[in-house]
Amino acid sequence: MPMQGAQRKLLGSLNSTPTATSNLGLAANHTGAPCLEVSIPDGLFLSLGLVSLVENVLVVAAIAKNRNLHSSMYCFICCLALSDLLVSGSNMLETAVILLLEAGALATRTSAVQRLHNTIDVLTCSSMLCSLCFLGAIAVDRYISIFYALRYHSIVTLPRTQRVIAAIWVASVLSSTLFITYYDHAAVLLCLVVFFLAMLVLMAVLYVHMLARACQHAHGIIRLHKRQSPAHQGFGLRGAATLTILLGIFFLCWGPFFLHLTLVVFCPQHLTCSCIFKNFKVFLTLIICNTIIDPLIYAFRSQELRRTLKEVLLCSW
């Protein structure tokens, strides 16, 4: 089966451009004008997916092993790692299937291949939606822990957390099934873009509010101890830098993919847009990179989780 015919419906079929032969080159659009096209080698794509897979498996194993990590916050982090694991795993699986089909090593009927790709499509789309949802859930959890600290354990109970997690998984699977079924409708793509923007705005508002509260708290401590104001300014700058990195990574890794979907709706035949479409695999690679970065931001900063992770690694040896 050719490369174009094997690409996924919702995600891959949006980019009908064949894989480039050079790592970085100028491809011509319909008028012959040069387009910047970055080709991601399959080996690099699979390697990044493997790193993400191993990293997130370790996070899930560490949280499952340590009962002290069975709190609501770590449940969300564990589900984020699991969804990131599925994002990288499903993309690796589809890439491997395509390579095997092109090499003739996997000979099967067209109907069976189509069913396989439909299954992978649903898995990929639902895991992406779950990943975005759990990033938002972690932001909400941290917001409640700061602004409702005394009532946190009565608001964010483990049964409620489990119901939220179940609702996210079920809603993501059902939504992705509908998206894959009606992938050729512009409303489907716009719904995905609006969902991404909603998560971005939610995270930005919550984290900015948390930063403002932290700065107020630091300022109060400084006034109590009658220290100089530069310390407060330094804290504010560090907090702003951390917030910029957190939201910046989220936007840079996910934004290009949803920009691609937006352009598919509004300018599918435009020459400039067609140049952007040629870099679809780059956008998927950025999402894989985000699944590698997520554990570094949300999981590995925990001393308890790092200690448990060392135990898991020692046991594996």
Swiss-Prot record:
Residues 64-72, 141-163, 212-240, 301-317 are cytoplasmic. It is a multi-pass membrane protein. GO terms for cellular component: plasma membrane. A lipid is attached at C315 (S-palmitoyl cysteine). Keywords: Cell membrane, G-protein coupled receptor, Glycoprotein, Lipoprotein, Membrane, Palmitate, Receptor, Transducer, Transmembrane, Transmembrane helix. GO terms for biological process: adenylate cyclase-activating G protein-coupled receptor signaling pathway. PROSITE patterns: G_PROTEIN_RECEP_F1_1 (PS00237), G_PROTEIN_RECEP_F1_2 (PS50262). Its main location: membrane. The keyword Lipoprotein applies. The chain crosses the membrane at residues 38-63, 73-93, 119-140, 164-183, 192-211, 241-266, 280-300. It is found in: Cell membrane. Glycans are attached at N29. InterPro entries: GPCR_Rhodpsn (IPR000276), GPCR_Rhodpsn_7TM (IPR017452), Melcrt_ACTH_rcpt (IPR001671), MSH_rcpt (IPR000761). Residues 1-37, 94-118, 184-191, 267-279 are extracellular. Receptor for MSH (alpha, beta and gamma) and ACTH. The activity of this receptor is mediated by G proteins which activate adenylate cyclase. Mediates melanogenesis, the production of eumelanin (black/brown) and phaeomelanin (red/yellow), via regulation of cAMP signaling in melanocytes. PANTHER family: G-PROTEIN COUPLED RECEPTOR. Belongs to the G-protein coupled receptor 1 family. Interacts with MGRN1, but does not undergo MGRN1-mediated ubiquitination; this interaction competes with GNAS-binding and thus inhibits agonist-induced cAMP production. Interacts with OPN3; the interaction results in a decrease in MC1R-mediated cAMP signaling and ultimately a decrease in melanin production in melanocytes. This is Melanocyte-stimulating hormone receptor. It comes from Saguinus imperator (Emperor tamarin). The lineage of its organism: Eukaryota, Metazoa, Chordata, Craniata, Vertebrata.
